């Protein structure tokens, strides 16, 4: 759950939102439904996302008792860190024939849960770059493992979540892991 009103940086694709809540079942984390429509949720989807344009009227419920290994935690926003496309995404911003994009000092991708920036990919560019839709997808968040919260859903990987520019009720996820 991300309170965007407190974030030090909010990607342009999220400026109309105040709060995002992401739900991913740990047993579906490796093969989630790729695109979801939050205007018409599919009950068979393996992940869900709720968005709120304002915090007005929202309340913080008591944490229910359950057997989950997940631990509710209040996270803290870290300072912004500039990041850059890695070798999987370099072709989006430069001529890869002219630059050694494998050089350590060239590609500084932030490998942590974050809003916006460039995806710190594990295997390839996110699949939505090649999706057979008319949508332009903007990466809005990357979710890494969060050991303090008990979330290790992707082993040594991450999930990348994007939002459609043309149809903002469509959201995409790409999960990569080793």
Regions found by a protein language model. Name each.
Residues 1-178:
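Preference for intrinsically disordered or flexible, low-complexity segments
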């Amino acid at each position: 759950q991300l309170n965007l009103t407190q974030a030090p940086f909010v990607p342009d694709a999220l400026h109309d939102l105040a709060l995002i809540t992401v739900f991913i079942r740990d047993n579906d984390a490796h093969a989630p439904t790729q695109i979801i429509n939050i205007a018409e949720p599919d009950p068979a989807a393996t992940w869900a996302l709720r968005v709120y344009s304002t915090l007005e009227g929202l309340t913080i419920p008591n944490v229910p008792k359950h057997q989950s290994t997940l631990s509710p935690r209040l996270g803290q926003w870290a300072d912004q860190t500039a990041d850059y496309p890695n070798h999987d995404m370099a072709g989006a911003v430069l001529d890869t024939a002219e630059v050694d994009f494998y050089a350590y000092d060239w590609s500084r991708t932030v490998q942590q849960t974050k809003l916006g920036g460039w995806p710190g990919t594990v295997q390839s560019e996110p699949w939505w770059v090649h999706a057979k839709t008319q949508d332009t997808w903007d990466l809005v968040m990357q979710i890494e493992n969060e050991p303090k919260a008990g979330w290790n859903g992707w082993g040594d990987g991450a999930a990348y979540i994007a939002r459609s520019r043309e149809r903002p009720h469509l959201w995409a996820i790409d999960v990569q892991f080793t």
